[in-house]
Each structure stands twice: as structure tokens, then as C-alpha cells.
Amino acid sequence: MQYDYGTEDNEVNHIYSENERQKERENECAGPCLYLAPPADVCIFFLFPFVLSPRGGGKEKKKKKVRKVRCASPLLLLHPDITPNTKPRAAVVSNRSTHSSTVCRSLSTMCMFYGYVPIFSAFGIIFCFDNYRSCYC
């Protein structure tokens, strides 16, 4: 009697490749990266200016833009298996980061680099959606 192991082999290969991808993502998250545990997040990338207070009555310094990443709770309609009490997480993204600094220079590039899909951009805000666990600089 002959058995067809094709389906089983494909399943094993699929599981192996998923495990390999998970290891790669964990390696990307090594170092100064913040590892985001929720498997699905709606992430908002935004820029905001702030004024540094002058010292000694000197001239006011120029406004500096600080890049921040804020991850809101998952979209429950798309992912009903995710609990609604997922806390928002935030991380400051800096050009001086030692990890993937070239990627951090562009928020949209960083969004796509880590597997996020840009949904739309408005008023300097890039809304991204992720189906996988990801990390940020």
C-alpha cells in the first residue's frame, strides 16, 4: 500500500518556514528595539514639533521634530480574537538610533520595512496596519 506524504511534507515545511520567520523577526527586535507583543496593531506614525526652552535668556532654539510611534488597540472588527483591553504602546524613534538608522529616517519606509501596510497619510500622520508581531527602532 502506498501513502502520499505530499500534504504532510508541505505542512511541515510551512510550520518550519513560519518558525524561521518568527526567529528572524525576533532577531530584528534585538538591541534597542521595542518588541510589540500584540499580534495585530493599528499603528499611527506621527511627527510633532516642540520648542526647546532657551537658556540664559539666549535666542529661542529652532523647533525640532520628534518622531514617535504610537500603537493603538487592535481593530476588533477585523480581529475578533484579540481582547479589547490591549494597552496602547509608544516608542520614540530617533535618527541617532544604532539599529536600522537608515530605515528610521523615513517613517513610511520604516512602516513597510517592518511588515506594516500604510493605509493612508494625512496631516503628517501615517496610519499603518500590521498582522504580525513587529519591532521598532
UniProtKB/Swiss-Prot annotation:
Bilayer topology: Multi-pass membrane protein
Source species, domain of life: Eukaryota
Localization: Membrane
UniProt keyword terms in alphabetical order: Membrane, Transmembrane, Transmembrane helix
GO CC, any one term: membrane
TM segment ranges: 36-52, 113-129
Primary location recorded for the protein, binned into one broad class: membrane
Protein name: Putative uncharacterized protein YKL031W
Organism: Saccharomyces cerevisiae (strain ATCC 204508 / S288c)
